Amino acid sequence: MSGKQSEEFKRTEKMTRMEYLFPVRFAVGWMFLDGGLRKAVLKPAKLDPNSASFVGGKLVNFLPHAGPFKGLLLMTLENRSLDVTFLTVFSYIEIIAGLFIIIGLLTRLAALGALAMSVGFAPAYWLGSTCEDEWQIGALLTAGSVTLMLTAAGRVWGLDYFLYKKLGDRPIANVPILKWIKLW
């Protein structure tokens, strides 16, 4: 095999391995997109504090196990407008992160946001206040988000390919820990 053929083979082999991450990217993105859409679009009553479907009730169940988030959560629950605002913003962040992960746009940054959401609500997953298996969903979303954040999964079958081709690697910020996390 000539040098040029060998180089092309290595590139093709690497692309194939990265293609295997597309199902992970799609599944993680869909979980976040679906979670946000179910609250904000498909059943807006979940964001209505006067509705029996209001998602804020789950936050009350989570309060005793909130750990370091207890003060913030208590402040949110005591102020109804803040509660609704938090849940609405959170829902739209889920939609944006999920959509960006699915289409492969700023995948690493979107996966970092997804990871923050997954880890932030990890105590609620482990509590399983509304479903016995929530911890499994949380664990998979955390693992999937870490995988997508550490790889360039959006560069294969995603819009990050075009950003990388035009601009090269770009860190989130030139801060020691953040320079290792690339935007695409």
UniProtKB/Swiss-Prot annotation:
Q: What is its EC number?
A: 1.8.5.2
The UniProt note on how this protein's activity is regulated states: Inhibited by sulfite, metabisulfite and dithonite.
Q: Which reaction does it catalyse?
A: 6-decylubiquinone + 2 thiosulfate = 6-decylubiquinol + tetrathionate
Please list every transmembrane segment annotated in the UniProt record, as residue ranges: 21-38, 86-106, 109-129, 137-157
Q: What is its main location?
A: membrane
Top-level lineage group: Archaea
Enzyme class name: oxidoreductase
The Gene Ontology terms for molecular function here are: quinone binding; thiosulfate dehydrogenase (quinone) activity
Ubl conjugation as UniProt keyword: no
Record-given protein name:
Thiosulfate dehydrogenase [quinone] large subunit
What is the organism of origin for this protein?
Acidianus ambivalens
